[in-house]
């Protein structure tokens, strides 16, 4: 081959490669990976899709904070190894969180291309999904307790990790917990699978149990102790447990039979709860879009203990 032919061939190849590059969307980021430590566990994250406004390091910090919140509440992480798939979507915010037991623990979640660091710092969804891994897999009729625990524990875990405020948590609980109260035609938590009863009805169960455990143990134990015991007994999402086994495990850990009895009251019938009276006893009043506290209220110490940091051991 002559020198002239070689040069022409080289330029043709270069032009063809440049043409192929032009066909790739400019915003496509391809795939990248990072690993986060969560106590003695490992989270392996994969990012796919279009380029994001936030950096990989900011995404890594977001994952780390969610993991830290779970460790703060449970004293450990839920599974030895979590696979986390982060996808992009055209927009802003975090959405589409789903948690599965496959691969030893798998979470899929989406981050918008226009999402900011502040959006990630205020996100609750990834923590919510991670909490799902801390409780045994339930039969379909008990899905309310899976969502209820994730809904109730998530803000408390973030408070204990220094990521959220107790005043904001109580404001949101006063605002949203009534969504979990039974409505006309309700047949109990095991038989009423509406959005309100599944998420907020489950959270209502957790809240009532937390307060009652603390009342019966002179505020020495709470729902957090029960949930830690369930996880420490091997009750994470990788395993199927009967709901009775999980609740009995929690009751034994706190030394009082609250969880199982409350379940018996709420599973088949629409048990009402006087939330207004409870807020008053806990010393919580909402004014001008914020929670105000009365530290002289009868159950004020219980209110404080619910979100207070707890040693890991």
Each language-model region and where it sits:
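Juxtacatalytic substrate-recognition/specificity segment
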Residues: 34-138, 142
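Acidic/His/Gly-enriched intrinsically disordered linker/tail segments
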Residues: 141-210, 215-217, 223, 232-237
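Soluble non-cytosolic domains of exported or imported proteins
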Residues: 53-65, 116-121, 125, 140, ...
């Amino acid at each position: 081959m002559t020198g002239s032919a070689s040069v022409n061939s080289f330029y043709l190849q270069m032009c063809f490669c440049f043409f192929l590059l032009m066909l790739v969307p400019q915003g496509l980021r391809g795939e990248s990976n990072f690993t986060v430590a969560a106590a003695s566990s490992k989270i392996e994250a994969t990012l796919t899709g279009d380029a994001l406004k936030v950096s990989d390091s900011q995404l890594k910090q977001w994952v780390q904070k969610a993991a830290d919140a779970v460790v703060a509440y449970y004293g450990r992480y839920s599974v030895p190894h979590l696979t986390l798939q982060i996808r992009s979507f055209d927009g802003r915010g975090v959405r589409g969180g789903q948690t599965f037991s496959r691969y030893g623990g798998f979470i899929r979640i989406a981050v918008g291309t226009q999402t900011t660091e502040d959006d990630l710092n205020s996100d609750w969804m990834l923590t919510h999904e991670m909490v799902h891994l801390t409780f045994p897999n339930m039969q379909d009729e008990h899905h309310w307790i899976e969502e209820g625990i994730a809904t109730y524990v998530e803000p408390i875990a973030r408070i204990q990790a220094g990521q959220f405020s107790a005043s904001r948590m109580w404001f949101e609980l006063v605002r949203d917990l009534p969504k979990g109260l039974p409505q006309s035609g309700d047949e109990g938590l095991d038989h009423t699978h509406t959005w309100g009863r599944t998420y907020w009805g489950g959270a209502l169960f957790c809240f009532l149990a937390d307060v009652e455990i603390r009342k019966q143990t002179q505020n020495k134990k709470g729902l957090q102790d029960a949930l830690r015991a369930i996880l420490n007994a091997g009750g994470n999402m990788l395993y199927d447990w009967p709901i009775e086994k999980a609740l009995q495990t929690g009751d034994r850990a706190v030394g009082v039979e609250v969880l199982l009895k409350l379940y018996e009251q709420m599973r088949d019938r629409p048990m009402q709860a006087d939330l207004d009276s409870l807020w008053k006893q806990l010393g919580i009043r909402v004014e001008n879009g914020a929670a105000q506290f009365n530290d002289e209220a009868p159950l004020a110490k219980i209110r404080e203990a619910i979100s207070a940091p707890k040693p890991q051991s």
